[in-house]
Amino acid sequence: MESQQLSNYPHISHGSACASVTSKEVHTNQDPLDVSASKIQEYDKASTKANSQQTTTPASSAVPENPHHASPQPASVPPPQNGPYPQQCMMTQNQANPSGWSFYGHPSMIPYTPYQMSPMYFPPGPQSQFPQYPSSVGTPLSTPSPESGNTFTDSSSADSDMTSTKKYVRPPPMLTSPNDFPNWVKTYIKFLQNSNLGGIIPTVNGKPVRQITDDELTFLYNTFQIFAPSQFLPTWVKDILSVDYTDIMKILSKSIEKMQSDTQEANDIVTLANLQYNGSTPADAFETKVTNIIDRLNNNGIHINNKVACQLIMRGLSGEYKFLRYTRHRHLNMTVAELFLDIHAIYEEQQGSRNSKPNYRRNPSDEKNDSRSYTNTTKPKVIARNPQKTNNSKSKTARAHNVSTSNNSPSTDNDSISKSTTEPIQLNNKHDLHLGQKLTESTVNHTNHSDDELPGHLLLDSGASRTLIRSAHHIHSASSNPDINVVDAQKRNIPINAIGDLQFHFQDNTKTSIKVLHTPNIAYDLLSLNELAAVDITACFTKNVLERSDGTVLAPIVKYGDFYWVSKKYLLPSNISVPTINNVHTSESTRKYPYPFIHRMLAHANAQTIRYSLKNNTITYFNESDVDWSSAIDYQCPDCLIGKSTKHRHIKGSRLKYQNSYEPFQYLHTDIFGPVHNLPKSAPSYFISFTDETTKFRWVYPLHDRREDSILDVFTTILAFIKNQFQASVLVIQMDRGSEYTNRTLHKFLEKNGITPCYTTTADSRAHGVAERLNRTLLDDCRTQLQCSGLPNHLWFSAIEFSTIVRNSLASPKSKKSARQHAGLAGLDISTLLPFGQPVIVNDHNPNSKIHPRGIPGYALHPSRNSYGYIIYLPSLKKTVDTTNYVILQGKESRLDQFNYDALTFDEDLNRLTASYHSFIASNEIQQSNDLNIESDHDFQSDIELHPEQLRNVLSKAVSPTDSTPPSTHTEDSKRVSKTNIRAPREVDPNISESNILPSKKRSSTPQISDIESTGSGGMHRLDVPLLAPMSQSNTHESSHASKSKDFRHSDSYSDNETNHTNVPISSTGGTNNKTVPQTSEQETEKRIIHRSPSIDTSSSESNSLHHVVPIKTSDTCPKENTEESIIADLPLPDLPPEPPTELSDSFKELPPINSHQTNSSLGGIGDSNAYTTINSKKRSLEDNETEIKVSRDTWNTKNMRSLEPPRSKKRIHLIAAVKAVKSIKPIRTTLRYDEAITYNKDIKEKEKYIQAYHKEVNQLLKMKTWDTDRYYDRKEIDPKRVINSMFIFNRKRDGTHKARFVARGDIQHPDTYDPGMQSNTVHHYALMTSLSLALDNNYYITQLDISSAYLYADIKEELYIRPPPHLGMNDKLIRLKKSLYGLKQSGANWYETIKSYLIKQCGMEEVRGWSCVFKNSQVTICLFVDDMILFSKDLNANKKIITTLKKQYDTKIINLGESDNEIQYDILGLEIKYQRGKYMKLGMENSLTEKIPKLNVPLNPKGRKLSAPGQPGLYIDQQELELEEDDYKMKVHEMQKLIGLASYVGYKFRFDLLYYINTLAQHILFPSKQVLDMTYELIQFIWNTRDKQLIWHKSKPVKPTNKLVVISDASYGNQPYYKSQIGNIYLLNGKVIGGKSTKASLTCTSTTEAEIHAISESVPLLNNLSHLVQELNKKPITKGLLTDSKSTISIIISNNEEKFRNRFFGTKAMRLRDEVSGNHLHVCYIETKKNIADVMTKPLPIKTFKLLTNKWIH
């Protein structure tokens, strides 16, 4: 870079102050700045980089071009005329040209301001005092290297500066940014130092060492201007220069002050990070030092919070203060002041002990708000106060620590201290005892505490008032003393076994005895100096000996670490045995914990692992000696035998040895287990485990599936966790070759994060032993936990998680540490742990009423990962909660069915273990805790159903089968909660499976025909049909039918009273059937039996010829010849081979299908699409016999808890007959709010597009004068009901454009602010389809238009106000609306009236009567849908004329003019249309479905076997009672609404072949069972697989110029619940399917003929309306046809015999149909059933039949 620059400027031959710097800067040895200059960074890489980045252009080169340099003459350079500095203040020639400096001071060399060109300085003469610059780049520097010095010159005069003139000096770099100015000033100061100007640089007090000369001032001014361009100067520098542009010294002084301040901050931070305190200096001084540093940093803008400050202080504590690290590290809200109180207390106690004064220290663990007790996990804190004189110390209780202290030091084999030793013995480590001194531990000490910090010694404690010892072999005259109360430093009780004498035999052959207490619950044996002083023995820490008052030396003292010790060899042994001493005093407080209890508490781990863990303090709160290990050797846990049964062990030592060289958390093993079958959908089926190679730390995560995105989420989570929590980076992950690990997505993720995947070789499972062994261990534990607790299987992952928590805390036999210890974490506090499945009572924070019991029975699972609470399973609520508000249940009963656990009752042990935690709960109860039983992230396990048999038992107790009164309800407080056992009842879920979680897939028994006989009187039939409840509790309905029996009884298990039905046979003659009708009371009519009516007697009509074409009167507009062939011609009917017609007797036709369950729905009878969607109400009122099951709340059986509390989840009885209409199906929300689109949108590109759309919308609103901009109203002045909330919504349209819309919240608009009679009309879909069909047949041009901001063209009459848009920032103001804003109730109606008036008055159109939004004139037809217009015309110019007229008033955009003769593609109201005039039209939604369906989160199977049909015949939806908790129910209903909403949209647009399935599933929106959801998923899957299908139309070629409108009708008799029939109609115009309808008959039909009549009567009104529309749009004659495959229906329509109408209802229906057919000139024709395409609208069909009926018109 430098060579390039110099080559551009050959005139720089002798060097220049502007030359590019390519080497490190050279420094002198003087530093007048004292602090700041010494801290200035070396000018090395930064300066080189700054210069190397300069370009070679004249504008930015490090050596700016100077055209005047070639011949620098005084007259040739004009003075500067502009610049940042004032022209009148420029230096005079005399000032800039001092004597003796002619070349540098020449006026031509004064830099032009504002630095229009940089001056090129010629080298001064040899007499000059200023330095010369290198003549070439390659010239070596004769100055010292940068490493040789980094200080400034400290001269007192200018003469001294000139005594060490350097030959060559490198200039500073050019300043390129204001942010770089602080670093640049440092290099500039070094430049001045190297130029022998160090004496003029201001010192720390702001004054230079010497006075600056005029020549030096000129040099300073010019060089500063050269290398610091004005545009790059900071603001404060510019402010100084604006006052005095030559005051460079002030700038330097200010810069040095800032550098000094920065240096002080750095020093403070370093000091704070390296604090050290051990009590050698006063605590006040230490506190003052620390607080001054923190205050200084805070004042300089560096905020040090309490948490960070306390951590830094605690890290520097040592000696007796070190323990504060461990007692304080969990206190989250600790302050510096509180920490220093503890430090002061220890210091004062230390000083007081040394001065023989009473001492006291506040216990640092006594926090007011601390609800837990934390165990010190390090060596003792307060037991080693060793003053030189302790004779006058006050007696205090012993302050010792439990054995839970950590110890990682090796043991000592012996200790040896010379008898003549009088000098202090200082031991730096335990091995220093091997000093050649022969004093081994006495053999009488049979208790070898090899884990002691100094084995075989007593710890001298000045703070202990009593002597305590763990070994029973040194206690003489032991006796029981239960009244002694001893506490440790944390004020915790120390259980005492016995009291006795401790006898010493010192080296002067004297014997002494003191009192001693025996306890195994301390870390070290303590020798109280107070008790020694009582027998005239003192400790001299000057000579390190124990001595009497006369100076007699008794024993040496050993100093090890911070403490002083005396050997146990001076103790005399006793003859008492350990069992004797342990039995001297037995109480509840000293009783050891039984091993079976600890075994179960610690997740059924083996005894060896538990002992290692207790021995190494990885499990805290108690030690190894607190456990009774006598039964551990031969103890067999029955649950372990069952849960951990195995064949053989894994092969060990199979992984590579090089993995051991990795650091913690750099090498992970992972594996996936699953699936676990027969679980609820909400429970995880898999889990993925991770194991760290070094620490063996384990993680487990639940999975519901093994999809790529699920696995990727887990990997992302664990990598972030390790990075943030352990500051480590994962380098390698070992895994098997499963597809979930080898997929491309995960491989890219690992590659992006720099992680090496290590896969096992094929069929080499041994190489993956770490992960596989972990999974096996966890599964063994899981099975054992579930077996032991009796909890349902869907909680299996909670057992896995509990086991993981415990396993991470258990020590490894090899490393003797736990995974938590290896990871640097504290040990597991077992006092916070409960056995898995422990029965508890949880406080109900939100009871149903004030008198409702406050306790909810539950089972403890595992500690919470997110709080200090516990995860508890509540069977009655079917969910888990995270809470601390619980009480442990106690009981003495047997805990297992198979095993006798009477001898293993651990209630007392559990109470002792959780005593501290109990006090915490009690305090919370007193303070009225606000714990809200937060639902944990384990609620995925809460979906579990009671076994049907269990619920039947509950019902049998709650409801009397003979009592007619409602059952009484017993609340929980009617019975006292009995003592419970640890095991949950087996009835919860003994064999959980999908069959008893979801409604049974077994179909109920079908109605049986007891006798079908043909009688001589006309074929009398006897049909006994059982009364079936709308919802059955059991899987099967019991019914017995005798061939001759006429009595039938059915009991409804859901009714409050038993109903007996007696079937009364009804016989009739003359062609009728005998049937049985139940005698029911008026209250039972809703449960009546609906029997089949006799079929219509068609015997008389059979003799007559049955015409296929009904002769009717014709009008003049109808052709005279209407034959069946002309009606059926050109219809898209299937091609069938000719078959002879097969006539079936009507009586046989009317028999009910044998496999049709009359109360079940199939995808042949799932019922109506009508379904309520309102789910907010807690109680839904359904019609007919809907019942809410009210079960007694008798809970917790006194015998082994054989029944759970009846669940609070609402039982929803499946009753399709109660559903009347689809109120609304919630659409899929495709819009975004303002905060989603802009405020919190992380996609920058998308955010910018939404911002542009936002401003575009605002501009359009202002352009349309939407509101009054002349005045803003105060909110208090306006009636609140006239104020409408407003909001912005954003969405991305299908064409990729981003749109914003400002809308009003019309959903909360007050009714007084609009006219409810006004309607917002849009074009009916049938009208659009009719117009498109006519356009194809008549070669019409189709033009698509869009009117921008259509609603804003309509004025608003009402006085309404809205809040201004957010960008105006006037939240407290209102503006008055002038236009119909989107969202207002009246906006749609206002726009409709506005555009309607304009089309009629200005465009000459008229609206078709009966069809809103369809306008026509002689040439053009317009279909209007809000702001979208579709124009149809045979002449394109007619369309253009309409467009021109519209553009005069509205902002009209032409979406598609439609002028091409080739295929044109449209997107009209969601339909994707391909149209070629005169040939064909194809209607589909492929692109839309491809975009929308994946957003539904439906598990699609793109590569699997495609469904050939949306459903299969014979598949029935079970109507078992569905019981879900409210949130789960609402979630599933909402999911059903989304799925069915999309399916309905597609079906009614063009996929008429799916309408039956859509309608059927829509009836079950409020019954979202697993079966219903699975069927819905299959329907969506079928739509996805066939998303490319299209409705195909071809141009018709009629023989005569007529339009032919046909409806094909069909009905499926009695195939819906409660014997309702399904009816379907398909409408065709000129052979093209334009619409379809499938629905359940609103009335119950009594025969097939009646069902067909009902179907036809439903189709006629729409057929007539369509006929009117076709005649209005196209003046051709029209032929209307009605096709059915029911000959009996045709016979009734054409017959004049009224005797065929057996009752008034049927007669009126048939007569009306006769009138409609004759009055509307309908041609009724017969069509074969195999060709009846309407059959797909009424029932599920086999795949072959379904394809045959649909492949002609949709493919």
From Swiss-Prot:
Gene Ontology cellular component list: cytoplasm; nucleus
Residue stretches making up the Integrase catalytic domain: 660-835
RNA-binding as annotated region, ranges: 299-401
CDD domains linked: RNase_HI_RT_Ty1 (cd09272)
Biased composition (Low complexity): 153-165, 402-418, 960-969
MF terms (GO), sorted A to Z: aspartic-type endopeptidase activity; ATP binding; DNA binding; DNA-directed DNA polymerase activity; RNA binding; RNA-directed DNA polymerase activity; RNA-DNA hybrid ribonuclease activity; zinc ion binding
Biological process annotations from GO: DNA integration; DNA recombination; proteolysis; transposition; viral translational frameshifting
Protein name, as recorded: Transposon Ty1-ER2 Gag-Pol polyprotein
Taxonomic lineage of the native organism: Eukaryota, Fungi, Dikarya, Ascomycota, Saccharomycotina
